């Protein structure tokens, strides 16, 4: 699993101090919850981040040209874009400046906890990984 974020975000600082993380997903229709745990690998200004950047759409790249870091307090609701880019897509040259802030985070999964919610009884399982290979699986009491 991978995600993109701004190098200036607080989560990057936290992951640099401790690269362990958990993510929780829930599908209401299927009544399935997934808790995924693993270790984050941060890519900024390297081959992996460049490839991800080059594959991103222009509107996605626009997120990384904001002047202030994500989470910066403001007295009013703001997008963070300069006025001239508020409603328009900047040129490719301007968008390229966002690459400095763009970061790819790869998650190396260590475990997946699967939970199926049902009124007649829940079901729960645990899958454990090592070096991206499934090494153990089994049922748990919900």
Question: Each predicted region: which residue ranges?
Answer:
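Charged, gly/pro-rich active-site loop segments
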Residues: 33-142
């Amino acid at each position: 699993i991978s995600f993109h974020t701004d190098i200036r975000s607080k989560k990057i600082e936290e992951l640099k101090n401790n690269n362990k993380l958990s993510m929780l997903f829930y599908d209401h229709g299927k009544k399935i919850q997934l808790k995924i745990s693993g270790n984050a690998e941060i890519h900024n200004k390297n081959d992996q981040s460049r490839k991800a950047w080059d594959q991103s759409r222009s509107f996605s790249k626009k997120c990384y040209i904001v002047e202030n870091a994500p989470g910066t307090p403001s007295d009013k609701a703001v997008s963070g874009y300069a006025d001239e880019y508020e409603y328009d897509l900047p040129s490719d040259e301007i968008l390229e400046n966002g690459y400095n802030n763009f970061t790819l985070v790869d998650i190396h999964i260590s475990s997946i906890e699967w939970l199926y919610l049902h009124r007649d009884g829940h079901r729960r399982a645990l899958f454990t990984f090592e070096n991206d290979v499934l090494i153990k699986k089994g049922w748990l009491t919900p």
